From Swiss-Prot:
NCBIfam families, sorted: rpsE_bact (TIGR01021)
Domain of life (superkingdom): Eukaryota
Keyword Signal attributed: no
Family note: Belongs to the universal ribosomal protein uS5 family.
Subcellular location: Plastid, Chloroplast
Name under which the protein is recorded: Small ribosomal subunit protein uS5c
One biological process term in Gene Ontology: translation
Record's keyword terms, sorted: Chloroplast, Plastid, Ribonucleoprotein, Ribosomal protein, RNA-binding, rRNA-binding
Taxonomic source organism: Cyanidium caldarium (Red alga)
Function of the molecule: With S4 and S12 plays an important role in translational accuracy.
Length: 168
């Protein structure tokens, strides 16, 4: 499921946001009268220009879960710099729960070499050339959040220089 939405905020640049569903699962809660069925949706949104977010929504129907997931995504968007060859500037590692991911920059034309939920997060963020490996658990939510954790560790040179000058 992919949908494009445009955001225009009073003269600001108009970005096109895409959203994708990573996983929809049926979950149950045991209550006094029996079992209560609900759905959990894991959603990723990105603008293909270095901004991406992962969110989770739970509701009694699938459409409501997806809507709640999208609103959760919008609250958790991160931004990071992309190089001119649409890759990351340096290798990074990210962890969330038992999931751990390794992201390494790759040469022009190699494409996205990644799997699972990590691939969806990388594609929607706008990275075109990268090598990625997920270690540990195969849980979709933990791998997506570990990828977000790794991407949030990326810094531009100007911010690295300001950190170095601040520490001196």
């Amino acid at each position: 499921m992919s949908r494009d939405t445009s955001a225009n905020s009073s003269g600001q640049q108009n970005y096109t946001w895409s959203e994708r569903v990573i996983q929809i699962t049926r979950v149950t809660k045991v209550v006094k009268g029996g079992k209560k069925l609900s759905f959990r949706a894991i959603i990723v949104i990105g603008n293909n220009q270095g901004s991406v977010g992962v969110g989770v929504g739970k509701a009694s129907d699938v459409i409501g879960a997806v809507k709640k997931g999208v609103s959760d995504c919008k609250k958790q968007i991160i931004e990071f710099p992309l190089t001119s060859s649409s890759t990351i500037s340096h290798a990074v590692e990210g962890r969330f729960g038992a999931a751990s991911v390794i992201l390494k920059p790759s040469v022009q034309g190699s494409g996205v070499i990644a799997g699972g939920a990590m691939r969806t997060v990388i594609e929607l963020s706008g990275i075109k050339n990268i090598v990625a490996k997920q270690l540990g658990t195969k849980n979709h939510l933990n791998n997506a959040k570990a990828t977000i954790n790794a991407l949030s560790k990326l810094n531009s040179k100007s911010s690295q220089l300001s950190l170095m000058s601040f520490s001196n």
